[in-house]
Amino acid sequence: DPLWSRGLGDVYKRQRLVYCSVTGFGQTGPRAAEPAYDFLIQAMGGLMSVTGERDDKPGGGPQKVGVPIVDLTTGVYAALGIVAALLRRSQTGQGEYIDVAMLDVQVGLLANQAMNFLLGGRVPRRTGTAHPNIQPQRTFACADGDIVIVVGNDAQFATPVSYTHLRAHETRED
């Protein structure tokens, strides 16, 4: 326990206390005492393996997310844990210790990739702006710049197709 190891074991006398610890790698294990940074966790946790352009495209290869997504998401998870603990305390009178590790949070962000692998045997890979499961859903180059098309089903796809004055069967053949 982080409080006990810092000589703050008396905190246990305060049964209503809610406290949260945020670390890079958790309280135990070979990296428990090591510092962590968003970029490092993205690389170690596999997020960069699915972020960026495909390897066969110019600029392909691992990329970090453009915002400190692990830092931000870890903060949200910690805050949610604290709010849940405060709610529990209001109902039971008991405090709580919340332990949030950045690596755990980042691996949790890969839930869809894990599902694709565990259920379908598909190894996650970088797809650029394309979605790994839903097509068409990506950036398309146009004469005057790029356009993003996002559709979730055939009915949604019919709308942009009608705007382009193409027949749906011609688009399917392309």
Predicted regions mapped to residue ranges:
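Aromatic-enriched alpha-helical interface/lid elements that frame and gate functional surfaces
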Residues: Q135-R167, R172
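Single conserved hydrophobic/aromatic residue that forms the stacking wall/gate
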Residues: D1-Y12, H165-D174
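N-terminal Rossmann-like NAD(P) cofactor-binding subdomain of oxidoreductases
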Residues: K13-G52
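Oxidoreductase and adenylate-handling cofactor-binding alpha/beta cores
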Residues: G75-G95, G108-L119, V161-Y163
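The feature captures the short pre-catalytic strand/loop hairpin that immediately precedes
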Residues: G45-G66
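A short glycine-threonine-serine/GTX helix/turn-capping micro-motif
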Residues: P62-T73, G95, T127-H131, Q135-Q137, ...
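Flexible, acidic loop-helix segments that line cofactor/substrate-binding pockets
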Residues: Q63, E96-I98, D104, R167, ...
